[in-house]
C-alpha cells in the first residue's frame, strides 16, 4: 500500500481499491450512472479550496487505512458527519441548477438536515451512486481493476 501512495494524490478511482474495504463501493459505482462523469473525489472530497481538499483526503484516507490494517472495518460503511457534509455539498455543487431552479431543494445544507430542517439528498436518492449495495458481503464477487505492478511507472523507468 505504501508503494502505491502516489495514487492517493490524484483523482483516479482505482486508488480507492488499494485495499478491499472499498471494493464493493467501487464496483457498484463503476456500473452506475455516476461512473460516466464523476470520480470518487468528485463526491467525497471538498472542492472549495485545494488545502481543504488534500487535508480532508489525507485524513479520511488514513482513517480508512487504519481501519483496514487493524481489521476494524464495518460490514456496512456509513459516512461520518464530516464526510456526509462534504458529500451533500458536492451533490448541491454539481446539481445546482436542478436543485435551486427546478425542485428548490438545493438551498438545504447538511447542517439543516442535522437540525431536522430538511432531508439529505440520499434520503430520497438512496441508490445513488452505489446502487442497492449496502455491505461488504453484498458484492462478494465484485471485480475491480488491479494494478499491474505495485511499483509506480516513474520508478520502473528509473530502474530500467
Where do the protein language model's features map onto the residues?
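Short sequence/structural segments immediately N-terminal
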Residues: 1-160
Amino acid at each position: 500500500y505504501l508503494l502505491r501512495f502516489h495514487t492517493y494524490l490524484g483523482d483516479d478511482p482505482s486508488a480507492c481499491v488499494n485495499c478491499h474495504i472499498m471494493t464493493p463501493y467501487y464496483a457498484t459505482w463503476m456500473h452506475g450512472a455516476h461512473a460516466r462523469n464523476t470520480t470518487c473525489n468528485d463526491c467525497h472530497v471538498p472542492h472549495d479550496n485545494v488545502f481543504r481538499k488534500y487535508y480532508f483526503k489525507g485524513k479520511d484516507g488514513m482513517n480508512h487505512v487504519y481501519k483496514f490494517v487493524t481489521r476494524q472495518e464495518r460490514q456496512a460503511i456509513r459516512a461520518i458527519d464530516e464526510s456526509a457534509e462534504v458529500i451533500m455539498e458536492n451533490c448541491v455543487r454539481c446539481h445546482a441548477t436542478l436543485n435551486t431552479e427546478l425542485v428548490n431543494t438545493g438551498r438545504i445544507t447538511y447542517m439543516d438536515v442535522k437540525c431536522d430542517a430538511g432531508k439529505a439528498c440520499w434520503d430520497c436518492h438512496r441508490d445513488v451512486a452505489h446502487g442497492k449495495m449496502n455491505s461488504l458481503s453484498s458484492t462478494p464477487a465484485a471485480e475491480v481493476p488491479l494494478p499491474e505492478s505495485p511499483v509506480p511507472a516513474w520508478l520502473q523507468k528509473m530502474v530500467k
